[in-house]
C-alpha cells in the first residue's frame, strides 16, 4: 500500500510517500524555525500563513522525489490533531482536495500515534511496549498494548518538556528553539545548581515542569549572571529534566512488564537524554528514532496510517473531516 501523508500540526510543513507501513520513499520537511525564532516562539497565525505558502511546493516535491504519480497513491493520510487549529486545517484541506480530485480514500491520524510509529521505520515494534513521548507540546508515558490499543499512564500537569526548554532558553537569552540550544550548551557547562526534581515525591507517573522553569526565572531575575554561569544553568536544568524523565520511567517499569521502551518526539533528539536512557535501561530493548524521525514530519503519519487503516474497525470514509486541536488517546 502506497500512502501519501501530510503533517502540518505546528510549524513544520511536511509531505511524505511511504509503503506498507515500513518503507519511506520520500519525506520532505519545510521548517519555519527561521521565521519563528525572531519572535522567540511559534506564532499560530504566522505558522498558518507559512503552511499555506509552502504546502503545494512540499507536496509536489514529495511526489517527484518518490517518482510516484497521484494515480498510484492508495491512501491519503493527514494529521487531524492535536496541534494548532489553523495549521491543522491547511494540511487537512490539502489532503481532502487531493483525495477528492484523484478519488482516493483519506484518513485522519493522531499526531501522537505518528510519533509512536516513527519507531517502526527503522525497528520492529513489539507488544507490549512502554512509550515516552517528549516534545514541545506533550510529555506522556503510554502503554502500547497492541497496534491501536494505547493506555495513558502518565502525563504533564502543566508545561511539556519541550516547552520548558523553550521558556528557559528565552529566560537566559539564548533564543528559539530552546531544545537544541540548551542541549549543546549544557555539554559545555557544569551541573552546579541544585534545581528541584519536580514531582518525584508523588507516587504517580505524572510530570510537572512549570515549577522548575519558575525557579530558574526567579534565580536569573535576582542575579547578573555571566555567560559561563548561564551555560552552567543550562547543564543543571537539563540534568534535572533528564533525572525526572528517567526516574518516572523506572517507576512504571517496576510496576508493569514491557518488551521494549520507545522514546520518541522532538526532545528525543537530545544527545544527553539519548545517552542517559540507553545507559540506564540497558537491560531492556530501547528504541529511539533517528534524529530525522524525532521531530514532526509526515513519514511518521504515513507509517501510523498504514496500521490504522489495517486494524481500525471503522472510520469516516467521506471527505468531511475536521481538525481536532485537543485530540488525545
From Swiss-Prot:
First-level EC class: transferase
Metal-binding: present as a keyword of the record?
yes
InterPro entries hit by this protein: ATPase_NBD, Gcp-like_dom, KAE1/TsaD, TsaD
Q: Which reaction does it catalyse?
A: L-threonylcarbamoyladenylate + adenosine(37) in tRNA = N(6)-L-threonylcarbamoyladenosine(37) in tRNA + AMP + H(+)
| Cofactor note text | Binds 1 Fe(2+) ion per subunit.
What are the binding positions for Fe cation in this chain? Answer: 111, 115, 296
Task: Output the Gene Ontology cellular-component terms.
Answer: cytoplasm
Matching Gene3D superfamilies, A to Z?
Answer: 3.30.420.40
Per UniProt, the keywords (alphabetical) are: Acyltransferase, Cytoplasm, Iron, Metal-binding, Transferase, tRNA processing
| GO annotation terms (biological process) | tRNA threonylcarbamoyladenosine modification
| Enzyme Commission no | 2.3.1.234
The listed locations are: Cytoplasm
- Give all cystine bridges in this chain: none
Cofactor(s) in the UniProt record: Fe(2+)
Tell me one Pfam family matched here: TsaD
Query: Which is an annotated GO molecular function term of this record?
Result: iron ion binding
Sites where the protein binds substrate:
133-137, 166, 179, 183, 270
HAMAP family recorded for this chain?
TsaD
- State the protein's purpose: Required for the formation of a threonylcarbamoyl group on adenosine at position 37 (t(6)A37) in tRNAs that read codons beginning with adenine. Is involved in the transfer of the threonylcarbamoyl moiety of threonylcarbamoyl-AMP (TC-AMP) to the N6 group of A37, together with TsaE and TsaB. TsaD likely plays a direct catalytic role in this reaction.
User: What does the similarity note say?
Assistant: Belongs to the KAE1 / TsaD family.
Please state what the protein is called: tRNA N6-adenosine threonylcarbamoyltransferase
- Species in which this protein is naturally found: Phytoplasma mali (strain AT)
Recall the taxonomic lineage recorded for the source organism.
Bacteria, Bacillati, Mycoplasmatota, Mollicutes, Acholeplasmatales
Gene name in the database record: tsaD
Amino acid at each position: 500500500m502506497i500512502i501519501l501523508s501530510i503533517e502540518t500540526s505546528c510549524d513544520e510543513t511536511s509531505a511524505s510517500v511511504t509503503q506498507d507501513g515500513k518503507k519511506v520513499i520520500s519525506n520532505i520537511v519545510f521548517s519555519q524555525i527561521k521565521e519563528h525564532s525572531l519572535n522567540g516562539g511559534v506564532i499560530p497565525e504566522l505558522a498558518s500563513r507559512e503552511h499555506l505558502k509552502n504546502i503545494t511546493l512540499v507536496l509536489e516535491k514529495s511526489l517527484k522525489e518518490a517518482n510516484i504519480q497521484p494515480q498510484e497513491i492508495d491512501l491519503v493520510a493527514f494529521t487531524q490533531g492535536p496541534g494548532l487549529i489553523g495549521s491543522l486545517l491547511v494540511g487537512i484541506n490539502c489532503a481532502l482536495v487531493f483525495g477528492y480530485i484523484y478519488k482516493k480514500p483519506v484518513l485522519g491520524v493522531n499526531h501522537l500515534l505518528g510519533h509512536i510509529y516513527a519507531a517502526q521505520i527503522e525497528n520492529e515494534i513489539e507488544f507490549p511496549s512502554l512509550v515516552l513521548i517528549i516534545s514541545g507540546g506533550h510529555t506522556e508515558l503510554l502503554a502500547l498494548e497492541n497496534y491501536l490499543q494505547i493506555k495513558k499512564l502518565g502525563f504533564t500537569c502543566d508545561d511539556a518538556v519541550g516547552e520548558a526548554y523553550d521558556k528557559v532558553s528565552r529566560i537566559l537569552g539564548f533564543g528559539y528553539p530552546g531544545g537544541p540550544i540548551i542541549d549543546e550548551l549544557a555539554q559545555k557547562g557544569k551541573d552546579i545548581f541544585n534545581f528541584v526534581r519536580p514531582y518525584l515525591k508523588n507516587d504517580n507517573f505524572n510530570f510537572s515542569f512549570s515549577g522548575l522553569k519558575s525557579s530558574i526565572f526567579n534565580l536569573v531575575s535576582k542575579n547578573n549572571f555571566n555567560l559561563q554561569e548561564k551555560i552552567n544553568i543550562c547543564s543543571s536544568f537539563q540534568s534535572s529534566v533528564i533525572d525526572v524523565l528517567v526516574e518516572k520511567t523506572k517507576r512504571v517499569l517496576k510496576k508493569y512488564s514491557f518488551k521494549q521502551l520507545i522514546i520518541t518526539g522532538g526532545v528525543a533528539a537530545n544527545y544527553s537524554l539519548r545517552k542517559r536512557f540507553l545507559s540506564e535501561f540497558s537491560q531492556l530493548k530501547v528504541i529511539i528514532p533517528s534524529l530525522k524521525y524525532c521531530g514532526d514530519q509526515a513519514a511518521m503519519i504515513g507509517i501510523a496510517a498504514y496500521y490504522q487503516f489495517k486494524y481500525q474497525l471503522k472510520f469516516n470514509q467521506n471527505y468531511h473531516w475536521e481538525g481536532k486541536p485537543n485530540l488525545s488517546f
